[in-house]
């Protein structure tokens, strides 16, 4: 009896430094976010630079500092819990998890839209067939779920292949852009990099950019599966961050130089841009191989976020703030299979809703993306607030960074994160009805937050009798 009470499920340590670097690249750098941002013009380059300096860099500092102070499985959930208490930890983890219920379906949509180009330009119209798109999305969702249940020892290879696909796809895009620039020039002028007279549509991009730069914390969510995390994590964060940031700016500039901003499609924008550029330089044959590489990249993104975020309900299940069976691990593969299955089922429902209950595909995509931005950034309010709390604490306890560094990173990160959340409520130009957009944004966000409150307070009441039972069992064992 006592052995069952004290025994906690464990996950295998299978991730090395370069596994983490590739994980960071495939999780942070998402080529398909670039078109929705670049469609707003050259001014977004300045938003990228501001976000890299005031959000991404502080994020790296926060991940390394907090991972050293609080090593272990759980990431943003564990950090908020240790610094601010149980409820804030649960809310942070809940938002991190539920955001992926909205984000993973958009990844499925990316995959379908891009993969049909691998069959040739004549099959591109298949992406507009709702039945085909839904079936293919659900097949990918099932495959990713199975791979992550089998374990990161297997699933990490999809992440790694996805990272390689990302590098190849980004390299092809940038090289084509450079070729177009030197052979045909560009219509981009200095005025395109100025703030427009009506910046409303550009404002939404700032939240999406911050969302696109999230991902460095993902490895810490898998903290118990990293080999020698104290030595492995800092170098992996540095390399992964530099590579992802450079790829984002390079890809955005390439799109702006090679394609008019009013011709950039939010969905399929990258592969359409490559098709346009490849035809211009006489290498149209690369479209299908490029689509394959980009499809691998998208599959890697889905695998990385599905596997990483599923660790949140796994840990929350262990702490009894959600149904205890979410803390179960697979008897053979030692993975949080229950949490992965629940996440897959919810994502399945959202995929079906996306294809059958939405208006225009681009508008539905933009709504889901904006909702994901809000929920994803909530945990980072806690992350950066934690740095400020450490920075002002007396006496100061130094772990990796100085007081001044923690205060700068905490302040910069907290301000940019708050702005990113607020600006996500500004509608993008794809939105046709502003009031419907605002109602859905506020309503769905509140619904997710109220569900978090429900789960926490209902299961925390159930937790008290469990704790009492454990104490009685320990007393019986001692006597």
Name these PLM-found stretches.
Residues 95-110, 213, 218-225, 248, ...:
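Membrane-helix boundary/coupling elements in multi-pass transport proteins
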Residues 78-79, 85, 117-123, 236-306, ...:
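TM-loop-TM module centered on a large, flexible mid-protein loop between adjacent transmembrane helices
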Residues 1-50, 56-61, 70-73, 190, ...:
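Membrane-interface "cap" regions at the ends of multi-pass membrane proteins
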Residues 113-118, 164-193, 252-261, 380-395, ...:
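Hydrophobic alpha-helical segments and their helix-loop junctions in multi-pass secondary transporters
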Residues 10, 158, 326-334, 377-430, ...:
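C-terminal membrane-solvent junction of multi-pass transporters and transport-like membrane proteins
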Residues 132-183, 237-242, 373-382, 402-413, ...:
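Membrane-interface loop-to-helix entry segments
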Residues 36-40, 57-141, 146-149, 295-312, ...:
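Hydrophobic transmembrane alpha-helices that form the core helical bundles
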């Amino acid at each position: 009896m006592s052995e069952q009470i004290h025994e906690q499920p464990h996950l295998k340590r299978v991730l090395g430094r370069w596994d983490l670097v590739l994980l960071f690249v495939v999780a942070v750098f998402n080529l398909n976010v670039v078109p929705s941002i670049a469609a707003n013009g050259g001014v977004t380059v300045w938003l990228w630079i501001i976000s890299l300096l005031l959000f991404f860099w502080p994020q790296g500092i926060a991940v390394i500092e907090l991972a050293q102070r609080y090593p272990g499985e759980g990431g943003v959930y564990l950090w908020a819990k240790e610094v601010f208490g149980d409820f804030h930890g649960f809310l942070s983890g809940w938002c991190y998890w539920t955001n992926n219920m909205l984000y993973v379906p958009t990844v499925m949509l990316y995959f379908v839209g891009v993969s049909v180009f691998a069959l040739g330009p004549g099959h591109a119209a298949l992406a507009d067939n709702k039945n085909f798109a839904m079936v293919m999305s659900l097949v990918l969702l099932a495959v990713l779920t199975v791979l992550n249940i089998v374990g990161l020892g297997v699933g990490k290879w999809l992440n790694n292949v996805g990272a390689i696909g990302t590098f190849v796809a980004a390299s092809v895009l940038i090289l084509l852009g450079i070729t177009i620039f030197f052979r045909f020039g560009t219509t981009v002028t200095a005025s395109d990099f100025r703030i427009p007279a009506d910046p409303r549509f550009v404002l939404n991009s700032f939240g999406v950019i911050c969302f696109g730069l999230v991902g460095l914390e993902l490895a810490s969510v898998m903290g118990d599966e990293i080999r020698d995390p104290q030595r492995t994590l800092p170098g992996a964060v540095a390399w992964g961050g530099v590579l992802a940031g450079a790829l984002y700016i390079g890809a955005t500039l390439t799109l702006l130089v090679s394609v008019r901003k009013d011709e950039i499609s939010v969905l399929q924008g990258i592969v359409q841009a490559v098709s346009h550029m490849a035809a211009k330089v006489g290498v149209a044959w690369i479209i299908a191989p490029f689509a394959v590489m980009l499809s691998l990249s998208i599959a890697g993104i889905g695998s990385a976020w599905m596997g990483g975020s599923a660790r949140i309900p796994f840990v929350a299940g262990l702490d009894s703030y959600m149904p205890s069976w979410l803390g179960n691990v697979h008897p053979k593969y030692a993975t949080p299979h229950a949490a992965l299955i629940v996440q897959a089922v919810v994502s399945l429902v959202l995929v079906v809703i996306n294809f059958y209950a939405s208006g225009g595909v681009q508008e539905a995509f933009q709504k889901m993306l904006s909702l994901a931005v809000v929920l994803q950034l909530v945990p980072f309010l806690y992350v950066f607030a934690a740095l400020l709390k450490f920075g002002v604490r007396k006496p100061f306890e130094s772990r990796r960074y100085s007081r001044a560094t923690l205060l700068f990173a905490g302040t910069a990160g907290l301000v940019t994160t708050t702005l990113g959340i607020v600006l996500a409520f500004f509608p993008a130009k794809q939105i046709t009805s502003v009031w419907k957009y605002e109602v859905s944004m506020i309503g769905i966000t509140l619904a997710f937050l109220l569900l978090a409150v429900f789960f926490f307070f209902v299961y925390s009441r159930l937790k008290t009798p469990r704790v009492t039972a454990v104490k009685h069992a320990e007393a019986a064992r001692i006597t």
